[in-house]
Swiss-Prot record:
PANTHER family per UniProt: 50S RIBOSOMAL PROTEIN L36, CHLOROPLASTIC (PTHR42888), LARGE RIBOSOMAL SUBUNIT PROTEIN BL36C (PTHR42888:SF1)
GO cellular component: chloroplast; ribonucleoprotein complex; ribosome
Family stated for the protein in its record: Belongs to the bacterial ribosomal protein bL36 family.
InterPro entries: Ribosomal_bL36, Ribosomal_bL36_sp
Entry-linked NCBIfam families: rpmJ_bact (TIGR01022)
Disulfide bonds: none
Designated name of the protein: Large ribosomal subunit protein bL36c
Keyword ATP-binding: no
Keywords: Chloroplast, Plastid, Ribonucleoprotein, Ribosomal protein
Gene Ontology terms for molecular function: structural constituent of ribosome
GO biological processes: translation
Organism name: Oenothera argillicola (Appalachian evening primrose)
Pfam families assigned to the protein according to its UniProt record, in alphabetical order: Ribosomal_L36
Subcellular location as annotated: Plastid, Chloroplast
């Protein structure tokens, strides 16, 4: 999980989701997991 100021999709399988007011990227590739912090 990378915590970044600006999250974006890295590949086509990445999905942007809003959880508890935070934007999260989930993907089949675990290296693409990101959270806005």
């Amino acid at each position: 999980m990378k915590i970044r100021a600006s999250v974006r999709k890295i590949c086509t399988k990445c999905r942007l989701i809003r959880r508890r007011g935070r934007i999260i990227v989930i993907c089949s590739n675990p290296r693409h997991k990101q959270r806005q912090g």
